[in-house]
């Protein structure tokens, strides 16, 4: 795995599904794995911090200790939005801190998930991007038709990518992003190339 990542411009790791629960020991193991493959960022779902329902509460002290541990390993944590998760991201930033440079914990805006959300007005993707612009450290890019989390190639769904690129430019985002495309109808490389082409045409 480490050899496969050697020539990549950057490496990000998504927390593995079997660890999708709040367990600081397992989270540290994932941080160690990320560090071992040279990943600069570890993307975690809210459930990995114990946040599923509005009544759930962060173990603030332990989350901060985990984030500090990640910093010693050269890994930044990024909490990814799921559908309708403004309340979650706001809570994390309110209780842990809004500056990733200080907390070593930022936001990964998943554009596809934002497109499915109903908690952010008529243009949810742009709302998520603008709302978390100062805390964004990573992006997940994929498309869908606004109904299911399809992880389509860019341009195959209903996301307005021109508007996405314009919003990111206006926000001054200069961080990393990753294509999160499933399948590509049997031609995954073509799906990736087409998605890159969509972005290049809008740059």
What is each residue range found by the language model?
Residues 1-5:
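Aromatic-lined substrate-binding rim segments of carbohydrate-active enzymes
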Residues 6, 10, 15-107, 116:
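Active-site acidic/histidine proton-transfer and metal-coordination neighborhood
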Residues 32-33, 38-40, 57, 86-203:
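Histidine-acidic metal/acid-base catalytic patches
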């Amino acid at each position: 795995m480490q050899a496969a990542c050697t020539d990549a411009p950057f490496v990000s790791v998504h927390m593995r599904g079997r660890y999708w629960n709040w367990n600081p020991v397992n989270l540290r193991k994932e941080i160690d794995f990320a560090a071992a493959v040279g990943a600069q960022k570890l993307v975690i779902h809210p459930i990995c911090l114990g946040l599923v329902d509005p009544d759930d509460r962060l173990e603030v002290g332990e989350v901060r200790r985990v984030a500090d541990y990640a910093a010693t390993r050269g890994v930044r944590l990024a909490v990814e939005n799921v559908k309708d998760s403004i309340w979650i991201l706001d809570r994390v930033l309110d209780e842990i801190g809004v500056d990733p440079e200080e907390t070593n914990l930022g936001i990964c805006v998943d554009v596809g998930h934002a497109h499915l959300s109903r908690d952010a007005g008529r243009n949810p993707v742009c709302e998520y991007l603008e709302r978390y612009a100062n805390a964004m450290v990573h992006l997940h890019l994929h498309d869908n038709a606004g109904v299911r989390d399809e992880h389509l190639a860019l341009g195959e769904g209903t996301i307005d990518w021109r508007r996405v690129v314009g919003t990111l430019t206006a926000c001054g985002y200069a961080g990393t992003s990753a294509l999160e495309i499933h399948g590509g109808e049997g031609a995954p490389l073509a799906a990736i190339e087409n998605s890159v082409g969509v972005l290049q045409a809008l740059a």
